[in-house]
């Protein structure tokens, strides 16, 4: 606070602007003017000093006590100066009623201010409560309707998942049956191919046998033709010999009787038929043994093939079941991952909401703490003001008790020097501002020549309030108030 000229204030109690580091500047002052008693006294009087003005012995007006103002200034040093002027005042009035009335008025003003601050505090608390009640439903919306729809959708999803699993199981069963039928078909095809291969082998053997039979028949036919040729040749030779010899020679040949060729052939047939039968039986036996071996091999191979096919079918079934289980596990994993992502998103949203709620509550708590600290500081300041007022009351009471009636006025000039008080906890400096006390001309019936002419000086009180934060001036407020000083004129 910068002061220019006379730094007294005649305005009533008005708090200055609230700022972050400057608390309220409270001013408690009395009304302008003094009580009637022959002198008109201004309220600009230095605190703690009694100013007297010289009078003639014949002119002794009744002195009146003038109320002094109290200024509460926070974080400012008050400096008071007047252009090298000596102030003259009057003596102390010992009227106890007027003094007590003044003190009662000041105490009533103080109590009125305390009640006003309490009302403001209650209004602020009610506003804070209303704001918190208003913000609660916004921060905590009702999701019950959404929960019901979510539950219905989850039930539908579960039903569709069950239906899908049932259809998948049916598809798997049909695939398994199709695989079984395909395996049976392949087995039948393989058996058919084996039978066809066996029939082809038998056909080849039959062809070989038919070829052998044809060869034998050709040999028999050739032998028959040779036999006929031999017979014909023999007949021709006999005929030729008979023709050469004629009928002259009778040659008797005692030869063995000619064998019957049919009989010989029959005998040969009888000899060869058992051999052929034995050979045929051997061949048939060999063929049957080969066929039995082949059949046994076919049966064993078919059994092995069936076993292998059964194993393959079982392995395919196990593979299909494992694939179905794997797909089910994959679907379950995907569903669990989707549920996990949904839950993470939901809980992250909830966490963000809760974090925002916590931040809002922390901000509100910080504001409430700041308000409480500010109110605590104001309360401490008011308590300090109360203690100062009590001290002043005690000093006034002691002064009233020490004064025994009216005292004579002793002329004395006093320099305006402020007497500062000690600072309170919040850094506010409480000082009694200087008040310039002067008297109007003597109001007695007989004018006193010793009073002399009086002059009125107009002094402007300029009060500048600055709000400083981080070494920078944020806002500034200037209040100018005029003040009249009455002093004897120079002759």
UniProtKB/Swiss-Prot annotation:
<feature type="region of interest" description="Head">
    <location>
        <begin position="1"/>
        <end position="96"/>
    </location>
</feature>
<feature type="region of interest" description="Coil 1B">
    <location>
        <begin position="143"/>
        <end position="243"/>
    </location>
</feature>
<comment type="subunit">
    <text>Heterotetramer of two type I and two type II keratins.</text>
</comment>
<dbReference type="GO" id="GO:0005856">
    <property type="term" value="C:cytoskeleton"/>
</dbReference>
<dbReference type="GO" id="GO:0005882">
    <property type="term" value="C:intermediate filament"/>
</dbReference>
<keyword id="KW-0175">Coiled coil</keyword>
<feature type="region of interest" description="Linker 12">
    <location>
        <begin position="244"/>
        <end position="259"/>
    </location>
</feature>
<dbReference type="GO" id="GO:0005198">
    <property type="term" value="F:structural molecule activity"/>
</dbReference>
<dbReference type="InterPro" id="IPR018039">
    <property type="entry name" value="IF_conserved"/>
</dbReference>
<comment type="similarity">
    <text>Belongs to the intermediate filament family.</text>
</comment>
<dbReference type="InterPro" id="IPR039008">
    <property type="entry name" value="IF_rod_dom"/>
</dbReference>
<protein>
    <recommendedName>
        <fullName>Keratin, type I cytoskeletal 39</fullName>
    </recommendedName>
</protein>
<feature type="region of interest" description="Coil 1A">
    <location>
        <begin position="97"/>
        <end position="131"/>
    </location>
</feature>
<dbReference type="GO" id="GO:0030855">
    <property type="term" value="P:epithelial cell differentiation"/>
</dbReference>
<feature type="site" description="Stutter">
    <location>
        <position position="345"/>
    </location>
</feature>
<keyword id="KW-0416">Keratin</keyword>
<feature type="domain" description="IF rod">
    <location>
        <begin position="96"/>
        <end position="407"/>
    </location>
</feature>
<feature type="region of interest" description="Linker 1">
    <location>
        <begin position="132"/>
        <end position="142"/>
    </location>
</feature>
<dbReference type="GO" id="GO:0045109">
    <property type="term" value="P:intermediate filament organization"/>
</dbReference>
<dbReference type="GO" id="GO:0005829">
    <property type="term" value="C:cytosol"/>
</dbReference>
<dbReference type="Pfam" id="PF00038">
    <property type="entry name" value="Filament"/>
</dbReference>
<feature type="region of interest" description="Tail">
    <location>
        <begin position="404"/>
        <end position="491"/>
    </location>
</feature>
<dbReference type="InterPro" id="IPR002957">
    <property type="entry name" value="Keratin_I"/>
</dbReference>
<feature type="region of interest" description="Coil 2">
    <location>
        <begin position="260"/>
        <end position="403"/>
    </location>
</feature>
<keyword id="KW-0403">Intermediate filament</keyword>
<comment type="function">
    <text>May play a role in late hair differentiation.</text>
</comment>
């Amino acid at each position: 606070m910068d002061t220019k000229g006379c730094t007294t204030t005649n305005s009533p109690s008005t708090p200055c602007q609230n700022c972050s580091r400057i608390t309220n500047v409270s001013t408690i002052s009395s009304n302008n003017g003094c009580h009637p008693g022959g002198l008109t006294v201004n309220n600009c009087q230095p605190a703690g000093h009694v100013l007297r003005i010289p009078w003639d012995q014949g002119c002794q007006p009744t002195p009146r006590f003038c109320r002094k103002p109290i200024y509460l200034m926070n974080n400012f040093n008050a400096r008071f100066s007047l252009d090298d002027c000596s102030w003259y005042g009057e003596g102390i009035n010992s009227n106890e009623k007027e003094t007590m009335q003044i003190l009662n008025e000041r105490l009533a003003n103080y109590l009125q201010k305390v009640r006003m601050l309490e009302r403001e505090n209650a209004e602020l608390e009610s506003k804070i409560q209303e704001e918190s009640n208003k913000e609660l439903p916004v921060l905590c919306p009702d999701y019950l309707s959404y929960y019901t729809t979510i539950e219905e959708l989850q039930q539908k999803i579960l039903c569709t998942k069950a239906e899908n699993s049932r259809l998948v199981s049916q598809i798997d069963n049909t695939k398994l049956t199709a695989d079984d039928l395909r395996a049976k078909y392949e087995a039948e095809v393989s058996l058919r191919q084996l039978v066809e291969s066996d029939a082809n082998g038998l056909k080849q053997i039959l062809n070989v046998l038919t070829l052998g039979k044809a060869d034998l028949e050709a040999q028999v036919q050739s032998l028959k033709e040779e036999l006929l040729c031999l017979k014909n040749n023999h007949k021709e030779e006999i005929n030729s010999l008979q023709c050469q010899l004629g009928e002259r020679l009778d040659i008797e040949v005692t030869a063995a009787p000619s064998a019957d060729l049919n009989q010989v052939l029959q005998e040969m047939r009888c000899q060869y038929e058992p051999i052929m039968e034995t050979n045929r039986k051997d061949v048939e036996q060999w063929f049957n043994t080969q066929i039995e071996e082949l059949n046994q091999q076919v049966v064993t191979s078919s059994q092995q093939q069936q076993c292998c096919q059964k194993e393959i079918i079982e392995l395919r079934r196990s593979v299909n079941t494992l694939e179905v289980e794997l797909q089910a596990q994959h679907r379950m994993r995907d569903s669990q991952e989707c549920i996990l992502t949904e839950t993470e998103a939901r809980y992250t949203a909830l966490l963000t909401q809760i974090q925002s709620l916590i931040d809002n509550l922390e901000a509100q708590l910080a504001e409430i703490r700041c308000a409480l600290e500010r109110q605590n500081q104001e309360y401490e300041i008011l308590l300090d003001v109360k203690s100062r007022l009590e001290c002043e009351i005690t000093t006034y009471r002691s002064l009233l008790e020490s004064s025994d009636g009216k005292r004579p006025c002793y002329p004395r000039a006093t320099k305006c020097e402020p007497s500062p008080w000690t600072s309170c906890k919040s850094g506010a400096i409480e000082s009694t501002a200087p008040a310039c006390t002067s008297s109007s001309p003597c109001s007695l019936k007989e004018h006193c020549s010793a009073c002399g002419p009086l002059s009125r000086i107009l002094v402007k009180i300029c009060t500048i309030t600055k709000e400083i934060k981080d070494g920078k001036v944020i806002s500034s407020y200037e209040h100018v108030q005029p003040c009249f000083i009455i002093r004897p004129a120079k002759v």
